[in-house]
Each structure stands twice: as C-alpha cells, then as structure tokens.
Amino acid sequence: MKVLVLEDTVSHQVRMETTLAEIAEELGIDIQVQVTGKIKEFKKYIENGDVNQLYFLDIDIKGEETKGLEVAQFIRHHNPYAIIVFVTSKSEFATMTFKYKVSALDFIDKDINNDAFKNRIKDSILYTKSTLIENTNMVDYFEYSYRGNDVRMPYND
C-alpha cells in the first residue's frame, strides 16, 4: 500500500511514520510511506504519476489555514478514487471538507491520545486495504431499471 503524508510539523511527521510502521507490522502488510511538509514536493509526487491509495493531510500548512483542503482538491482532480484523511488540530474545519467537495474518509484530531490516534489511522488503512487493494477484481456492470425493478449484470455475462 502506498501512503503519502502532507504534514509540516516534524514531531507530527514522526508520529505518523511511527504509527504507520507499527500498524504495518501488526497487520503484516507492506506500507510504503512518503512524508513531506512541502506542498510543491507533494504535488510533484502526484503529477509524476505516483499513484498512492491513501493520503493523510494536515489542513493548516505553514500558516495557511485551508491549504490542506486545496491540496485535497488537487488530489481529487488527479486521482478520483484516492482515500483522503485529514489529520489536523483544526477540528473547526471539519465541515469545510464538504464545501471543498473532497470526500474525505475521516477527520482525525491530532490532540487525541496515542491509542485512539493509532486506532483511527488503522481503521483508514483497513478500509483502504479492503476497498482499493483487495477489490482488484472489479468489473463493469450494465445496469438498468424497469418498472421499479433494478437489474445489474456484469458485462462478461
């Protein structure tokens, strides 16, 4: 699983890396983590075609209160299926994720204790694993509705 983290505070970067490493070991899965506090570097990963399944974003980057939300829009533009999770101390911005239309999976407060923090990150990892990685046999369906009855049939049938 490829994870990209945007966090400008070193102590929070270390917390994320440590937490992700612990979860990877517990679950026995390979998690490739890339952490940066620089928006240009972050966007470069995405523009270069690096497909990450899961993104953890701080909202307030270098004093710009909504920069993380703008970055989430950038991610959504380049990868509409990405899983985005906000990890921030700006809990008052939770409702703004709807305004920016970024479809965030979760909004994790940095100030929660380490066990709760780890559990929330783990939930995001497990969700990503089950929806994007294990569901590789996704097929196209033909769907139609007739007289109130819905029919869904795989194209290969």
Can you say where each PLM-predicted feature lies in the sequence?
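Non-catalytic signal-transmission and effector/linker regions of two-component phosphorelay proteins
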Residues: 1-4
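Conserved acidic carboxylate
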Residues: 7
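Charged phosphotransfer/docking patches of two-component systems
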Residues: 10-17, 94
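Acidic, metal-coordinating helix/loop segments flanking the phosphotransfer/catalytic sites
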Residues: 17-18, 32-54
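Alpha-helical interaction/dimerization surfaces of two-component signaling modules
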Residues: 19-23
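A generic structural motif
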Residues: 24-33
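CheY-like receiver
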Residues: 52-131
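Conserved binding/recognition cores within well-folded domains
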Residues: 119-157
